[in-house]
Amino acid sequence: MTATRKSTRPSKPLKATLVAYAKLMRLDRPIGIYLVLWPTLWSLWIAADGLPDWDVLVIFVLGVVLMRSAGCVINDFADRKIDGHVRRTANRPLVTGLITPKQAVLFFVALLVIAFILVLFTNPLTIKLSFGGALLAFCYPFMKRYTQLPQIVLGAAFAWSIPMAFAAQTNQLPEAIWVLYTAVVLWTVAYDTFYAMADREDDLKIGVKSTAILFGDQDRIITACLQLMALVAMAMAGERFGLGFSFKVSLLVAGGLFAYQQYLIRNREPNACFRAFLHNNWVGLVVFLGILVDKLITN
């Protein structure tokens, strides 16, 4: 009589739970990870003059995934009572009940703890800065209830990897990093306004505030101005960091990508606005390639 072979596959309830946590972290939609990762890579390559320490690089790539995931978890916790009223978010795990609010909070804390353990392998300056990053990640989701400029807080959170990367790689915070920081904040406000434009009608019904609502009919011109200012700030940062021709070319290409995004949102159609938001991944990549090529040439 042969013994019954036990299946090594996870049970359906376990599999459903794992999938729910992955969705809570937005691992099925990694665009947020990419948009935080690109400025991080820019900063590491500039700070290290083209050759980041491998351990610092690994710490920051993992840290970006963990902190972006933590931000998504606390965002869904904060929005759990309103997400059911928005078509795009109605199937999130906290809305459907696959994950409870208590489980979400515990998971958020766990992600922060793991990220902090990684930071402990850097230096005291980076460790100190990490508390600011955690605070920004926690605060952003709640800003949508109190200000029509929550995208600025999001930009501050997304750009926080810049000072942390310089601190980890060089143990210094040169003044020029704040020019690059400002550029990323401006860029983030622009592309997250596109994201908010896709949800504007639902947000108006449920009372959620955003720059898309604040800007109103002037949204296209204001986002275009934000993109232009972001490019100018990037160019200024590039001059201060001694970046050359390749970087300048990358900014010209980024400007062309911004122009295409403005074309996409011309009719303010929600799906097109969301496409414009997603398209910013290419902007981050192009700027990184400009920095990478510049460092390869100069070194």
Curated annotation (Swiss-Prot):
Transmembrane segments annotated in the record for this chain: 31-51, 54-74, 105-125, 148-168, 177-197, 241-261, 277-297
Protein's membrane topology: Multi-pass membrane protein
Any one Gene Ontology cellular component term annotated for this protein: plasma membrane
A single GO BP: ubiquinone biosynthetic process
GO molecular function terms listed in the Swiss-Prot or TrEMBL record: 4-hydroxybenzoate polyprenyltransferase activity
Principal localisation: membrane
Gene3D superfamilies the UniProt entry points to: UbiA prenyltransferase
Family matches, as Pfam families: UbiA
Catalytic activity: all-trans-octaprenyl diphosphate + 4-hydroxybenzoate = 4-hydroxy-3-(all-trans-octaprenyl)benzoate + diphosphate
E.C. code: 2.5.1.39
Record key words, sorted: Cell inner membrane, Cell membrane, Magnesium, Membrane, Transferase, Transmembrane, Transmembrane helix, Ubiquinone biosynthesis
Annotated metabolic or biological route of this protein: Cofactor biosynthesis; ubiquinone biosynthesis
Cofactor: Mg(2+)
UniProt subcellular location: Cell inner membrane
Assigned protein family: Belongs to the UbiA prenyltransferase family.
HAMAP family in alphabetical order: UbiA
Reported function: Catalyzes the prenylation of para-hydroxybenzoate (PHB) with an all-trans polyprenyl group. Mediates the second step in the final reaction sequence of ubiquinone-8 (UQ-8) biosynthesis, which is the condensation of the polyisoprenoid side chain with PHB, generating the first membrane-bound Q intermediate 3-octaprenyl-4-hydroxybenzoate.
Name of the featured protein: 4-hydroxybenzoate octaprenyltransferase
The organism of origin for this protein: Saccharophagus degradans (strain 2-40 / ATCC 43961 / DSM 17024)
